[in-house]
A protein has these predicted regions:
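Conserved phosphate/anionic-ligand binding catalytic regions in large, soluble enzymes, centered on
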Residues: 107-125
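Short, surface-exposed, charged/polar-biased interaction segments
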Residues: 71-75, 118, 128-131
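Generic N-terminal targeting/processing segments that precede catalytic cores or assembly contacts
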Residues: 1-108
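A structural-propensity feature for long, helix-poor, extended segments
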Residues: 145-154
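Alpha-helical support elements that line or immediately flank enzyme active sites
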Residues: 123-135
Length: 154
């Protein structure tokens, strides 16, 4: 994306009277030379890939090295049987992040969002948010555009 600063993206939004996420989507479509609808569908596909990656988690499978794999299941058990200090929502995010990390280490579908080093933090947060707060998919897609724009600028 060609935005060099948050201010630049914000100014486009103000100039065209559109929200921040839409400015990012328009820039994405322009940069990739696709229709706005195609940009939306691509982000929707990425969201579904994140959901699929989390669904693919198997708590009894370990990585080839044997070092990781069960942590997401352990966190789920803790959440169900204890009262996590960080509360239900944050512990759900932690569980999702551990599952994504285990799947990445086990060479399942790799979701490197925002980067491979963060190992699926965006999916972990957004999936927990969708489940916990019962928001619609369009809201998540808009949030993904927002996050991708911020990530690109930073």
């Amino acid at each position: 994306m060609s935005y060099q600063s948050m201010e630049e993206a914000k100014l486009r939004g103000e100039k065209e009277n559109i929200p921040f996420w839409k400015a990012i989507q328009l820039e994405d479509a322009q940069e990739r030379d696709v229709k706005i609808e195609d940009s939306w569908e691509k982000m929707k596909y990425m969201w579904q890939s994140m959901l699929d990656a989390l669904d693919a988690y198997e708590p009894d499978k370990v990585s080839r090295s044997g070092l990781v794999g069960t942590e997401g299941g352990l966190m789920d058990n803790y959440r169900e049987n204890e009262e996590p200090l960080c509360g239900d929502f944050v512990s759900k995010v932690m569980s999702n992040a551990l599952k994504m990390g285990c799947n990445n280490a086990g060479m399942k579908r790799i979701v490197a969002a925002p980067t491979a080093g963060s190992c699926g933090i965006i999916p972990a947060v957004f999936i927990a948010y969708e489940q916990y707060y019962k928001v619609n998919e369009d809201s998540i897609i808009k949030a993904l555009f927002t996050a991708s724009g911020i990530g690109e600028i930073v």
